[in-house]
Every structure is written in structure tokens, then in C-alpha cells.
Amino acid sequence: GIDFTGNTYPGAQVPFGMVQLSPDNGLPGWDRISGYFYPDTTIAGFSHTHLSGTGAGDLYDISFMPVTRPYKEAPAPLGVYSTFSHNDEMASAGYYRVLLKDYNINVELTATERCGIQRYTFPKAEASVFLNLKKAMNWDFTLDSYIEVVDSMTIRGYRFSQGWSPLQHVYFETHFSKPFMACHMDTTSIVTKDRGRIGTAYIARFDFNTEKDEEILVTTGISGVSMEGAGKNLRAEVSKDDFDYYQAQAAKTWN
């Protein structure tokens, strides 16, 4: 299972789904092949692709992390993170929930076949959501990436990576249920190989002012073909900001 070397993850997906939306502890190692190891006490992001029960660590694509400012950050690979307790964690078919203790943010995850739906419940705070396309663990590393701000509620881009499986292409489009006030883009992380530049690892921070118990939904469609395909998947499968509806649909699919 999720303990020792069972190498499974606790997050949300539907049967045969392209999306496996799950927390990542943020640390490398044989025990964390799936991104999650039960004895760990940190979470450093919620990414949309995972392998279950394998002996090789890969994927972890399109990683989001909600925080309040100031936030906690450690040297890579952990980066921006929070502590958590299993007492504040719950999972069922197609659903996952955890409290990020350092920010008092409740995170809930569910999924459709090609989309991930996240619901963040914030305290009254200066809040942010990170999107880290540089985030990598174990065999996986970023070859190139891109983030485009379409408008104050929509972004899209891609992450190309290499690891256990070569030349993985994951395209995405993400919709926020609330406009972000500001976007801070870090494009200074250059990817090199054989002393030559091969790409850029994008990291973005989207800022919000939140009231107590305010909910923000972050919905992401993915595609292996194009950003346009990811957007079509998002609009086809998640047509409204209604987390409870999609959670119920995911549970129904499993049943």
C-alpha cells in the first residue's frame, strides 16, 4: 500500500483515468516512488499524474501547492511545503482530503477521466497558489515547460520531461474559480544537458486575498497532444465550478 514499498498513492482518480491527482511528499527515495510515503509528514504539491505499484519513480506532472504568505520553503527537491497529520487526512474512491497545517488550508481532490478538480478552503489571509513545472523526484526531471496566462482566471501550458519513460509530453489548461490578483512568473531556471540549454523550467505564483472559509476551485484538463486538446478536455468534462457534483460522479463511477 502507501506504507513501506507498496508504492501506491492515496489521491483521486476514476477507473482507467488519465489523471491521478494526488499529494506528493516532496522527497526522493525508493519508498516514495508513487510520490507519497505514509511515514512522511510533509506535502509539497498536488500533481496530476502518478504511477501505482511500480518499481520506478516517474510522472508527478503539473504540480499545484496552495499557501498563505509568508510560506515555508526548503532547498530542492522539497521546495515550498507544509506539514500535515494523518488525523487530518481522508481518502475514498475518487476523493482525497488533507489539512495543510502550516497554512490552515483544507485541500480536497477529485477527478474525471482527463481532469483534476481541487477545492481549497482558505483562512482569511494573503494567499497564493504555486504551479511548479520544475518539481521533480526520483527518475523524473523537466526537459522543458511553458506557462501562458490567458486571462485572470485561465492559464495553460505544458511540461516535457524524461525519466523512467523517455520524452513525456503533458499539456494542460487550468481554470480558477476566482480571478487572481497578480501572477509572478519565474523563468530563470534553465534546463541544460551536455553544457547546452535545452529548455526552461517554469514556476508561477498566483496571488489572492481570501476571507475565512473562502473556497477556490482549481480545475485542470490534461492532454498528451496539445494545449488546445487539454482545453477541450476541460470544457467537455468540467463545465461548472461544482466540486461536490464531480466528487459524487467519481464515486458513482467506482460503484
What do the predicted segments below correspond to?
Residues 1-255:
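Accessory carbohydrate-recognition regions in carbohydrate-active enzymes
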